[in-house]
A protein has these predicted regions:
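Short recognition patches in nucleic-acid-associated and regulatory proteins
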Residues: 1-8, 18-81
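Short, compact, well-ordered microdomains
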Residues: 78-124
Length: 124
């Protein structure tokens, strides 16, 4: 069974890894905001820790930006009940344990895997 993580569990994971320095394997992914994963990086190199997806939940597109940020902002809050976090998985680097949020954007003719380094200060 896939573990559904609560806000509290996500915060615990983020706090326990907040001082981890990225290794050579994952340093290209260490962006404070969402980035598209390069086709050269195999996301399966990241260990699955859990998901923020609620099984059977309706797809929602509303985002949470009370301070005028947007999806791509490095200061955008991590609000697990809002898009894209409610469709994200939590993964860690198998070499250094750095933690990331990961989701796949499904466009009409493409798939875009996106990743963001998990910052405990931004979890709301």
């Amino acid at each position: 069974m896939i573990p559904k993580l609560s806000r509290h569990q996500l915060l615990d994971i983020a706090m326990s890894r907040k001082d981890v320095q990225p290794c050579e394997e994952c340093v290209p992914l260490c962006c404070p905001g969402w980035i598209s994963v390069s086709g050269y990086f195999d996301v399966r190199k990241l260990k699955f820790l859990g998901t923020l997806k609620a099984k059977g939940a309706e797809e929602r597109w509303d985002e949470y930006h009370p301070n005028g940020t947007n999806l791509w902002s490095v200061e955008a809050p991590i609000a697990i009940d809002h898009h894209p976090y409610d469709r994200s998985d939590v993964r860690e680097c198998t070499h250094c344990t750095r933690v990331f949020l990961h989701y796949t954007e499904y466009g009409g003719y493409y798939l875009d895997e996106r990743i963001r380094a998990l910052n405990p200060k931004l979890i709301v």
